[in-house]
């Protein structure tokens, strides 16, 4: 199965353009598609769905705002239609209003892909957005 990962620090290639950053996982995938044009079209479609500007493909990752970088990181995690997306503190660098907008966009994409999202966060206010919650502190306390 295919797994998408959203890193806390995004790990975008600063010298590569947005589309190259998004399709990067496909190049390392065992189920690599031979059609590069379709990969780029899929990446542009994800950019549009995540409300990135129409000309976003002309920018290098290093020139993007933090919010744009996060959206590119989400697109990169979703490009292969993963069954599981693992997100490590994907909203940690955003204020509360931007967090809600970003999470709405991310959850919409996860739902469209019918993926499962496993998100790590220290922000307990995010808990209400999820179907299931595991509090590691409680688990460790019960185990001891």
Where are these regions (language model features)?
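Catalytic Walker B motif of ABC-type/P-loop ATPase nucleotide-binding domains
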Residues: 85-88
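Short coil-to-helix segment of the ABC ATPase nucleotide-binding domain corresponding to the Q-loop/switch region
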Residues: 16-25
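Conserved catalytic motifs of ABC-family nucleotide-binding domains
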Residues: 81
């Amino acid at each position: 199965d295919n797994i998408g990962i959203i890193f806390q620090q995004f790990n975008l290639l600063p010298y590569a353009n947005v589309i190259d950053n998004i399709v990067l996982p496909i190049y390392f995938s065992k189920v690599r598609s031979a059609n590069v044009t379709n990969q780029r079209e899929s990446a542009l479609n994800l950019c549009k769905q995540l409300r990135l500007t129409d000309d976003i493909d002309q920018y290098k990752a290093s020139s993007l705002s933090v919010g744009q970088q996060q959206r590119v990181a989400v697109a990169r995690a979703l490009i292969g239609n993963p069954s599981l997306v693992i997100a490590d503190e994907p909203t940690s660098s955003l204020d509360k209003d931007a967090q809600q907008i970003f999470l709405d966009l991310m959850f919409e994409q996860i739902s469209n892909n019918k993926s499962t999202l496993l998100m790590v966060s220290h922000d307990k206010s995010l808990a209400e957005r999820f179907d299931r919650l595991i509090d590691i502190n409680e688990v460790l306390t019960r185990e001891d």
